[in-house]
Amino acid sequence: MVRLATFNDNVQVVHIGHLFRNSGHKEWRIFVWFNPMQERKWTRFTHLPLLSRAKVVNSTTKQINKADRVIEFEASDLQRAKIIDFPNLSSFASVRNKDGAQSSFIYEAETPYSKTRYHIPQLELARSLFLINSYFCRSCLSSTALQQEFDVQYEVERDHLEIRILPSSSFPKGALEQSAVVQLLVWLFSDQDVMDSYESIFRHYQQNREIKNGVESWCFSFDPPPMQGWKLHVKGRSSNEDKDYLVEEIVGLEINAMLPSTTAISHASFQEKEAGDGSTQHIAVSTESVVDDEHLQLDDEETANIDTDTRVIEAEPTWISFSRPSRIEKSRRARKSSQTILEKEEATTSENSNLVSTDEPHLGGVLAAADVGGKQDATNYNSIFANRFAAFDELLSILKTKFACRVLFEETLVLPKVGRSRLHLCKDGSPRVIKAVGVQRNGSEFVLLEVDASDGVKMLSTKVLSGVDSETWRNDFEKIRRGVVKSSLNWPNSLFDQLYGQDGHRGVNHPKGLGELQVSREDMEGWAERVVREQFTH
């Protein structure tokens, strides 16, 4: 887990406050207080993706990021308020005064039996929607960043979006391997209400900033997008009387949005070699040595060097899902074989090689550039990637017709990016996905897992799970998806042992010829028989 270099291990956030910067300086910082108290009371604003109230920063143990409430928005009626409106905010006057001054929204949810006032810090809502990585933390406080760095065109007839990332853009190309970040880009550029919400951050800053004694400061606020039909999965705490609830962290978002049917994204790095005569000249360019993400530290002072690729660091990102995602295509431009290619080579390891900077990269910067944050993609891609599971879907059909099975749920999710591995992508650069299907037979329930092998890289057996708890399945499935990538596209059997016991999971071999889709009906039925047999041997 990446660390904030300035602070001690296992410190808990107790207050997130105003943004500030010295007059004439470009970089923004944000006040943050911890328990135990730390000498420094601020960090870079570009570190915001790591910060939420009550979160333990620089944790030496794995944190479980599980929601304890789900807020369903039947309407978008949010009242502007301050966090002090939440009763029992803090027993410490200093925290109560500073945290209480921060902006919030209040949403009232009513059931036949109770009424709850949800207090949602405005910065936390914006962090979950827009400020998902260091790049967006910088660009939101500029009126021109997106217009200068992206060229976007929408074709109404085809319901098709074109996003061209311009050569001058500082958007980290590694973030384009995070499928949820790409879907968020599509959402932002295709929905004017969403773009208006994002741009309102800069408008609120201009209207409400203060300058005193050479320091510019601002209490964060913005206009939220319409949220009707959304679900927020949150962690927080209730007031003593249980009538109010303070959202400390938004763990996940279910967004009711119809994204364009297809989106093409182009970036200067998306290149394919063009066949032809001529030679290619490779020139080595020095970069920082490779250090695992968990050993990296984010520096609060030093600048970032533009000569190194911006390293994208996922740090326990929260998740998001869209009701109708977009099918993403990467537009690749051919390059001639005689073209000169700049290749990054690792520099000699230095004692500061584990320090990185989320400052905007520029010439003369001291440290390697980094971008921290991201989003886990919890979108169900059943319809978009259905063709990758044609044989598996035929298996399900046989289970239903011949073995009286009932399908309880189907979901197709992308495999996440883990470390520097690229196995979460297929050969063509599209997301690799995994399908989970809940099945019931004779009163018993089990889950089938099938990994996308459409590019022929590797074909895993069908996994049969029993003893799955619907309450923990979302978290279990996230661990399983990461485990598949960490295990180099193998089943993470030690993880399955932990989750369901050694007898709670079985592998079922595919019929021969499945990769070429040349399987007889008899062999398909044999596959289904093995699935049923394994389920009943648990």
UniProtKB/Swiss-Prot annotation:
DNA-binding stretch(es), residue numbering of this chain: 311-330
UniProt record, GO biological process: DNA recombination; transposition
Coiled coil: none
Region ranges (Disordered): 330-360
InterPro entries named among the record's database cross-references: TnsE_C, Transposition_TnsE
Keywords noted in UniProt: DNA recombination, DNA-binding, Plasmid, Transposable element, Transposition
Single GO MF annotation: DNA binding
One Pfam family, short name: TnsE_C
Functional description taken from the UniProt entry: TnsABC + TnsD promote high-frequency insertion of Tn7 into a specific target site known as att-Tn7 whereas TnsABC + TnsE promote low-frequency insertion into many different sites.
Name of the molecule in the record: Transposon Tn7 transposition protein TnsE
Gene (name only): tnsE
